[in-house]
Amino acid sequence: MRGFIIALQFLTRLPMPAPLRTIVVDDAAFARSMRWFPAVGLVIGAAVAGAAWAGALVDHRLGALAALIVWVGVTGALHLDGLADLADASGAAHKDRERLLAVLADPHVGSFGVVAIVLQLLSKLVLLDMLVDARAFGALVLVPFAARIGPLVWTWWLMPLHQGLAARFRSAIGPIDLAGWAAALAAAAWFTPALLVTPLLVLWWGWHVRRALGGISGDGHGAGIELIETGLLLSVAITGLWIHTT
């Protein structure tokens, strides 16, 4: 339970009761908390789905907007920052890996990063509108959960790019953790079959960052979570349209 609280504090901006804010967190406990990332995804998903449902009582477009605002607010735009950093680095590197890594280390956001954030938010808004209109609130709970299985796989599979978050987490994730969350994903896919594309998206992003960067970093995790969330929203939307037309 301690690991879940640590993960919740790290991945969200949700207010915590005073006793939970005083939990002592050392490097080992912080690393072990990664096992709980998918569970935190369920909390995020529940908040997003709740906002979508409440907004949809007025109009499905308001539901989509409310869901997006809560999604960004609850996570503190943590993963959008990683997406922006990688977009800036990829855009400025011109296929030069050393320059890519140098730009990645720059904390400032450039034009490529701004464009990436805008496109990501617009994509989510459009897809959320489709899902809210279809009353797919259960899928909204599960998408953030499924996307946060990705960091466990990348941490176990890929070498850390530098001595940062990825390096801390690597020693704490093992096959048992992956098997447990894979079983949970399979159970979730029974209710939302569109989640079956999750392994493909996770493997695609891992292959991409290994080829482009040579390993995984905190920015790689954040960008991957964002892109997989959007990919899963798209999968749910397409699956819903296919079911509706057959």
Swiss-Prot record:
Membrane spanning residue stretches: 37-57, 64-84, 100-122, 139-159, 185-205, 223-243
Location(s) in or outside the cell: Cell inner membrane
The keyword Cell membrane is assigned to this record: yes
Pathway assigned to this chain's UniProt record: Cofactor biosynthesis; adenosylcobalamin biosynthesis; adenosylcobalamin from cob(II)yrinate a,c-diamide: step 7/7
Pfam families per UniProt: CobS
Catalytic activity of the protein: alpha-ribazole + adenosylcob(III)inamide-GDP = adenosylcob(III)alamin + GMP + H(+); alpha-ribazole 5'-phosphate + adenosylcob(III)inamide-GDP = adenosylcob(III)alamin 5'-phosphate + GMP + H(+)
Primary localization class, coarse: membrane
The keyword Zinc belongs to this UniProt entry's keyword annotation: no
Source species of the chain: Novosphingobium aromaticivorans (strain ATCC 700278 / DSM 12444 / CCUG 56034 / CIP 105152 / NBRC 16084 / F199)
Family from the record: Belongs to the CobS family.
Protein name according to UniProt: Adenosylcobinamide-GDP ribazoletransferase
Entry EC no(s): 2.7.8.26
Recorded GO MF terms: adenosylcobinamide-GDP ribazoletransferase activity; cobalamin 5'-phosphate synthase activity
GO CC term (a single one): plasma membrane
